[in-house]
Amino acid sequence: LHGRYADLQDGQVADYIPELAKADPDWFGICIATRDGHVYEVGDTRQVFTIQSISKALSYGLALEDRGEDFILSRVGVEPSGEAFNAISLKPETGAPFNPMINAGAIATCGQILEPSDQTRIQRILDYLSACAGRRLDVDAAVYQSESETGHRNRAIGWMLRNFGILNEEPTEVLETYFQQCAIRVTCRDLAVMGATLANQGRNPLTRELAVNPEVVDNVLSVMSTCGMYDFSGEWIYRVGLPAKSGVGGGILAVLPGQLGIGIFSPPLDAQGNSARGIKVCGDLSRDLALHQFANGSAPTPSLRLSYTGSQVTSCRRRPLTIQQTLRASGHRIRVHELQGELIF
């Protein structure tokens, strides 16, 4: 796959944030991390870039943990908007953003994260994302400064949220935290491990640390499924069928729940703001490996090969005489099932 799309010239590197325009359009990495801790990677998987909007999915999880589902749903919806990620639009009846994956929803979400006396919000967000990645992450100061200096549209969104009471404080500090959150430095490998952490019900498969509360993982993956790929989300779930989140830094994080996480990095973006190579790679992976969540697959075959009692077989292991006597006397109470194939419950 890497060789297939390395020469693809589609897309343009984001330039509305000056620091992002410095990215090399030839950078290209693919990484898959499984829930049991195996990592497979090719290309520029250790090249550092900024996480951008991919951070929205995980900060949403942190806000859910802090405030609870009912409170967050009263401030941020979960409906696809069908609009651009930076649209200045809120629900007319409530003033709430449509979902946490667009800028308005992410800024509102950021403002709900608790800030204890001994930690700032960005420190808590960094701790959370670092636990998901399995290593200590930091903020790219130059990108943060660039985002802050050009973030006039996001400031307009912030003041609208304050006007409707979605933010209960002046938006200036919340916005600076949001700009820093988007400027967190990651690699393609980090994204894959983050995805595998979500696939593994919140437990990082490399460090074994419980990074995300399992109670919010399904909520995060659900919103990623319906809203994670900007205004391409409908076609994405139709063709690829995986919860995912993209960022204008060129990253894509995708998750096959219960199985694996996928991280892709390639800076040139398509018209919707998604990595052009990343979209192609994910489509091929989904098709070639049958990863689509809603694919029926082939007709299931019976998984039960044999069924018998313990009295019908003898143990190959050398055991003390007393245990042998117990097994002979009680073998009929042991049921052995030999299974092979896919188990569907």
Give names to the regions the model predicted.
Residues 1-3, 8-10, 63-181, 189, ...:
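Active-site-adjacent helix/loop patches that line small-molecule binding or acyl-intermediate pockets
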Residues 5-42, 253-254:
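A short, well-structured edge-of-sheet supersecondary motif
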Residues 20-23, 98-99, 149, 183, ...:
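Short Gly/Pro-enriched turn/cap motifs at secondary-structure boundaries
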Residues 36-37, 50-72, 194, 262:
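Active-site SXXK
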Residues 46-48:
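A short acidic/small-residue loop/turn micro-motif
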Residues 57, 185-204, 219, 256-267:
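Active-site-proximal alpha-helical segments within enzyme catalytic domains
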Residues 206-279, 284, 288-314:
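Conserved SxxK-family serine transpeptidase/carboxypeptidase catalytic domain
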Residues 292-345:
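The feature marks cytosolic C-terminal regulatory regions of anion transporters and related permeases
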